[in-house]
Structure formats: structure tokens, C-alpha cells
């Protein structure tokens, strides 16, 4: 019998459409191409409601957080999100402190929409700004300019309890001065959370086909150090690989991922992880919005499903938990995986000998070296079929 303690449960809702597909983006996002956005919104929202209606597992567990991601969720009206939040509230039960986040693109800002999002219960906004530099915005093919980014951020900070600003570094031909200017502009907005992502060239993207010149690994590391030092000086805590927060504004939804919590994925391509008394299982919805829409009415929206093996649980827990700079409590590993900590004794010893992790007061956490070489650290916990450490 699987006896893992049931973790917090979150809901992720995917809105797959955007105005323009950025050249670096490998997410499940699709440009509107001559389609009626309003009609598309209605059809897709009804499909999301249908999937929620057909979600009959663990409906008595409280919902820890809701996250509307994309794509560009801010293309949809407050009325659509109101329907979805109400359906989740009826189907499940919202935690008293439920964090409800919407991702927004500064190029799609509608003031009435922003006010409406707040009115329907959304209390956190994540703005995909990426840069305040006009040259870099054009290179990244963002649909907003610097002023639109500033206006959107100031409006969001005024309206919402918590606001995250997404920024990128190691951009094509980016200088240290340009990066410092981006950081300073972000700090002037006075948001309580900043996410900083290294630009990576992913397969199946425009940048992969036509690679721009980007800073090399050493130059990227220097830029990262500049970011971390500047944000720490400004009272931000670097709590996760790419995330900085102050005043207790860490993202509850993402922390649930990193702590190997459970989540239900609603919408095209959305993934789920669910713990039960028998097992931990993962499943995902069909990725193509068109195919997803055609299958929802048949209650056939699940593409694949699998039960996590012991090796899966070990690697997936560590892959998530070691992203958090404060690491994890030993008893959390045991609660979330239903495995004794001795299951990974050999791997922990190897990681300690390489000075990639340390154990302090019952917590296992990555060292500064481990944070810098996270991929190498995670490889230690990736086993082959014979349970041998790779």
C-alpha cells in the first residue's frame, strides 16, 4: 500500500494562444491566425469547464493555488476567468489563502480587463516583460515597447497583492550596462517578485533555425552574478534557481511544484501529477488545441498516463526540490515519495563528496557550487534500469 502523505493540490489552466510566437519560445503556444478571438475564447473556455466537470478525482482536497498560464491568458476576458474560478470553487474547495495568478503580456494590456481580473478573485499577476531595452525587445520580437511595459507593471502593482516581473538575460549582444539598466527599471516599479531567465536556444524555435549571437557560458555567469548581487542588495531573497522575492512574496504555486506537490492540469498540453493511496501518477492532455477541443466532449482529452516508479520518484523529487536554494527537509522526501531517505544514501554521499550539497539541521540543500552546477548535481540522482547511479 502506498502511504505517502497527500501534498497540497494546485490547478494549472493553460491558455495556448498568443498574438505572436516569439523566436525563443518552445512552449505550447499558437498564434491567432485570422481567427475570431472572442469566439475562440468562448469555445475554449467551455472546453475548460467541460474538462473540470469531468474531473472527478480528489475533489474534496482544498486547492492551494490556481495558475493561468500560456500562451497569453490576458487575451481572455475577466468573464471567462470568473467562470473557471467559480467552477473550480464548486468542484473543489479553495484554500483560505488560495493564490490565483494570471500571466499577462504588456502588449495586450486592457485597463478594464486588469480591473476585472482583480474583481473576479485573481490576486497575483506575472508580467512577461523580458526586457525594458527597445533593441532587445525588437530582437526578441516582443509585441510591446518599453513604455507599455512600464505602464502595465505600474498598473499591476497598484491593483494586485503580488506582482512578478519576468525578465531575461544573456540576450543577443547584451552588455552589462544594458542588464543593469533593466534591473534598475524593474526595481523602480517596486514589485515584490522578479524571475530572471537565461535565454536558451531550444529546438523547434525560430532562434534554433537562425541562431543569434549570445553571450558565452562565462559571460552568462558574470551576468547572472550581477543580477543576484544587485537584487540581494535590494532586499530580494534568491529562493529558487530563477526566482527572487521579498517580504514573503514567494510564488506559492511554483513552490508547490518544487516541493513535489500535486497539481491538476486543465487545457491543451497541460500536465497533472496526482498522489493517491495507491500511487503517484502523471498524465497530460492532448497538446494540439484543435485536437484537445475535439476530444473534450468525448471525455477523451488525456493523451498519456503513467505511474511513477521508485526511480522516477527519486529523480523527479530531487529535480524539483534542488531548484530551491534552501533545499528540503529529509522528512519531506519521505512524505512525498513514500521512500526512506536511505533509498538515496549512495547518491547523497556522492553529491556531498563533490561538495554539491550539504546537510544542515535535517535539511539537504545545494551548496553555491551545487546551485551553479545544478545539472551535474541532478545527474547523480538519475539512475539506469539496474538502479545504478549514472
Show where each model-derived region lies.
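Short active-site neighborhood of thiol/selenol oxidoreductases, capturing the structured segment around
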Residues: 11-15
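Short, Lys/Arg-rich nucleic-acid/phosphate-binding segment
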Residues: 244, 361-364
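Short, amphipathic alpha-helical interaction segments positioned at domain boundaries
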Residues: 371-390
Amino acid at each position: 500500500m502506498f502511504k505517502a502523505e497527500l501534498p497540497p493540490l494546485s490547478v494549472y489552466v493553460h491558455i495556448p494562444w498568443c498574438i505572436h510566437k516569439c523566436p525563443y519560445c518552445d512552449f505550447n503556444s499558437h498564434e491567432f491566425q485570422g481567427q475570431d478571438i472572442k469566439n475562440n475564447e468562448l469555445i475554449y473556455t467551455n472546453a475548460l469547464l467541460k474538462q473540470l466537470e469531468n474531473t472527478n478525482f480528489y475533489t474534496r482536497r482544498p486547492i492551494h493555488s490556481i495558475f493561468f498560464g500560456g500562451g497569453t491568458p490576458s487575451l481572455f476576458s475577466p468573464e471567462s476567468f470568473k467562470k473557471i474560478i467559480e467552477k473550480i470553487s464548486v468542484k473543489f474547495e479553495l484554500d483560505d489563502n488560495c493564490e490565483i495568478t494570471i500571466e499577462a503580456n504588456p502588449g495586450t494590456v486592457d485597463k478594464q480587463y486588469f480591473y476585472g481580473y482583480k474583481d473576479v478573485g485573481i490576486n497575483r499577476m506575472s508580467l512577461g516583460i523580458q526586457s525594458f531595452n527597445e533593441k532587445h525587445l525588437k530582437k526578441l520580437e516582443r509585441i510591446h515597447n518599453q513604455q507599455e511595459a512600464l505602464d502595465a507593471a505600474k498598473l499591476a502593482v497598484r491593483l494586485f497583492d503580488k506582482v512578478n516581473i519576468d525578465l531575461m538575460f544573456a540576450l543577443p549582444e547584451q552588455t552589462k550596462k544594458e542588464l543593469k539598466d533593466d534591473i534598475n527599471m524593474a526595481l523602480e516599479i517596486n514589485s515584490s517578485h522578479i524571475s530572471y531567465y537565461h535565454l536558451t536556444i531550444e529546438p523547434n524555435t525560430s532562434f534554433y533555425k537562425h541562431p543569434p549571437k549570445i553571450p558565452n557560458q562565462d559571460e552568462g555567469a558574470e551576468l547572472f552574478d550581477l543580477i543576484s548581487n544587485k537584487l540581494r542588495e535590494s532586499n530580494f531573497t534568491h529562493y529558487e534557481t530563477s526566482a527572487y522575492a521579498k517580504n514573503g512574496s514567494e510564488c506559492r504555486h511554483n513552490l508547490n511544484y518544487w516541493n513535489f506537490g500535486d497539481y491538476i492540469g486543465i487545457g491543451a498540453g497541460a500536465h497533472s501529477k496526482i498522489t493517491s493511496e495507491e500511487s503517484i501518477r502523471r498524465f497530460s492532455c492532448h497538446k494540439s488545441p484543435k485536437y484537445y477541443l475535439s476530444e473534450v466532449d468525448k471525455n477523451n482529452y488525456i493523451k498519456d498516463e503513467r505511474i511513477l516508479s521508485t526511480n522516477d520518484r527519486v529523480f523527479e523529487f530531487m529535480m524539483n526540490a534542488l531548484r530551491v536554494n534552501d533545499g528540503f527537509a529529509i522528512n519531506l522526501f519521505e512524505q512525498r515519495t513514500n521512500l526512506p531517505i536511505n533509498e538515496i544514501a549512495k547518491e547523497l554521499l556522492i553529491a556531498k563528496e563533490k561538495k554539491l550539497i550539504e546537510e544542515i539541521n535535517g535539511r539537504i540543500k545545494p551548496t553555491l557550487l551545487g546551485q551553479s552546477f545544478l545539472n551535474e548535481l541532478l545527474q547523480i540522482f538519475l539512475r539506469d534500469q539496474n538502479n545504478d547511479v549514472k
